[in-house]
Amino acid sequence: MNPREEYDRGYHHLTQMFQEELRTHFHDPDGTVFYKGLKRMIDTYRIDLRNLRFFQVNLPSKHIADLVMEECASLGIPLDTLYTSMSKMGYCGPPMVFICLDAILREEKLHDKDLILSFVSEVSKFMQAGYAMRYYEQV
């Protein structure tokens, strides 16, 4: 079926994988699709993680974020860089990327060349997205 027609009719919600199917397809022996997608982004764009200040994981619960953080540590991402606002405001889906970025810019003291990294896997369709943003102090 045409993807636009599938979307317009709402069929994309009917074909999502849930529970055990999701676990089977999300976790591979060599890492989760999240880990592999993030690694591909870091490698493709040669993202230097040395000044990583915040890593914003856009997933619906902290325990899922904690699971992928264990894998991410092998990429050189320190566990203490995880940034989340879920405990304060819950999870509202894709807009969390911008809500967290706004919170970082308003509430945190950033230093010259601090790196903010964000990544998400939309697990029911395995779409992935991310950004890397470097902060520069004004001169």
Regions found by a protein language model. Give the residues of each.
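Hydrophobic pocket-lining "lid/loop/helix" segments that shape and contact the acyl-thioester
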Residues: 1-85, 137-139
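N-terminal start-of-chain detector that recognizes signal peptides
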Residues: 26-29, 88-91, 104-106
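Well-ordered alpha-helical segments embedded in enzymatic catalytic cores
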Residues: 33, 37, 96, 100-103
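Cysteine-centered functional microenvironments
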Residues: 82-96, 119
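Conserved beta-strand-centric core segments of catalytic alpha/beta enzyme folds
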Residues: 1, 98-139
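Gly/Ser/Thr-rich loops at beta-strand to alpha-helix junctions
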Residues: 58-63, 90, 94, 122-126
